[in-house]
C-alpha cells in the first residue's frame, strides 16, 4: 500500500506549492535478486529496512531515489509532499509519520486534505515462497476515494521565494511578512531559522527553535515603542 495522497496547496495564480516532485517506489520480490539490485539506490534511511526484509516471503514496496525500470524493477510513481527546496515551510507546516498534519495549514486543514487523495496498492499473485506466479505481473490498483480538493492560498510564490532568499542571507532569527495594501491578503510569510519538513528530527536535534513560526509569535515591544507614544 502506498501512502494515501493528500490534497495540495497552490499559490494565488495556481502554482503548486506541494505534490510536484516525483517519488519512486520499487517492488522488492523475494528470490529475484531484488535486494542486490535495489540496495545502491535506496536512501540511507531506508537501507536498514531493506536489509531486515531481504528474506521476506512476501513482496513489498520500498522508496528509491531513481526510476529503475531499465533495471527490470517494477516501479510505481508517486509525488513527494514537499518541493526539493520547500516553500513557506512554517505556514504550510509538516506531517507526522502517519501522514497527518502536525503544524500550520497541514494541521488546520488535515481532515479536508486527507480526504482529497486516492489510495493506491500493488497487487501481486505469488507462490507459497513469495515468488511471482509464472505468467503474472504486478498490477497497480487505485481506489477512487478522494474528493480532489485543493487549497489556494493568497501567497505569491515568486514573492515568497524572494523573501526567503533575503531572510536566509540577512537574518539568523526573525520573520518577513508581505501584505497587500487594501485587501490585507498575505503575499509572503517567512520565518527564520527554517526547518526541513522531510526531516523534523534534525530540527529537534539542532535545538535552534526553527519549528517556531515567528510570523505568528508575540514579541515584547520594549522601550523602542516609547518613541511611537512620545
Please place each PLM-identified region on the residue numbering.
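Short, solvent-exposed alpha-helical surface patches in non-cytosolic proteins
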Residues: 88-90, 185, 227-228
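Short, glycine-anchored, charge-dense loop/turn motifs used at functional sites
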Residues: 2, 9-19, 163, 179-188
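Structured interaction and signal-relay segments at domain junctions
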Residues: 190-194
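Carboxylate/His-rich catalytic cores and anion/metal-binding grooves
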Residues: 113-127, 170-189
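A conserved glycine-rich beta-strand in the N-terminal activation segment of trypsin-fold
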Residues: 5-8, 173-175
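Active-site loop and adjoining helix of the penicillin-binding protein/serine DD-peptidase-beta-lactamase fold
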Residues: 142-182, 197-230
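Structured segments of extracytoplasmic/periplasmic soluble domains
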Residues: 94-98, 112, 161-170, 189
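Small/polar-residue-rich segments within soluble enzyme cores
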Residues: 16-23, 28, 32, 36-148
